[in-house]
Amino acid sequence: MVGLLGKKLGQTRVYTEDGRSVSVTIVQAGPNQVLQRKTVGKDGYEAVQLGFDGQKEQRLSLAKRGHLKAHNGEENYTPRSPGRTVKGKARLANRKAWDARAITPIRRIKEFRDFSLDVNPGDSIGADVFEAGDYVDVIGKSKGRGFQGVVKRWNFGGGSGSHGSGGWRRRPGSIGAGSTPGHVIKGKHMPGHMGQASRTVQNLEIIQVQADDNLLLVKGAIPGANGDYVVIRESKKKPKKTK
C-alpha cells in the first residue's frame, strides 16, 4: 500500500482530454519525510512513519521533540538518553550530545503499514508516487458545526408549522416508549455535537498529478475545510465499474 500526508487547498474545475468538465479537489501531497521504518524484528510489525509540514521548534511537545531527535534520518540510531545508570562526566557528555542533536520540526506524523515503496529514513517522497487514473481513499476530519439540533444534524422532518403545533417545529419529539423498555435505546438520534469527526471517502480518481508542485487533483469532494490535513492512500476497494 502507498500513502501520503497532505493538505486540502480547495476545489476547482478542470477539463479532461475528451472535453468533459470535472470538479476536483486540489491536495498538496508532500513532500513527506521518511522518519522511521519499523520492522518485525525490532517493533513487531512492518510500517513506515512519514512526517509532513513544518512547525516552529518551540511549539513541539517534549515527546515529539525526543522522537524526532531519535529518528532524525538515521535508521539504526539508538538514543543514549542520560539516565541514572550513567554517572559523572559520561552522563554529562551524553546529555550534551543529546541536546546538540539537530532536528527538523514536523507538525504531522503518521504510520503506514505494509508500505510498498522501498524507502529509508531521511528520504523524501511526494505526489509522484501516484499517477493519473489511480484510485485513492482520502481520510480527513469533517467541518465542525458545534451543537446542533436533530433537523440539521440528522435531517429530521420536524413538526407541523401550524394547526396548534405549539412551537414543535424543530423539536425531536418522543425519544422512546414508557416502562417497556424503560430506557432510551442506544444510538437514538438526538441533538449534540455535529462534525469534527474522521471521515473516509473511497475510490476517488486522480485526474492530474503535478509532481513539480506536489499537487494532486482528485475527482470530487473530500472531508474538511481548506487548509485541513488529510491522508491519501491507495484505494483498498477497487471500483467494479469505471467510466
List each model region and its residues.
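Extended basic (Lys/Arg/His-rich) segments that typically form rRNA-contacting surfaces
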Residues: M1-K243
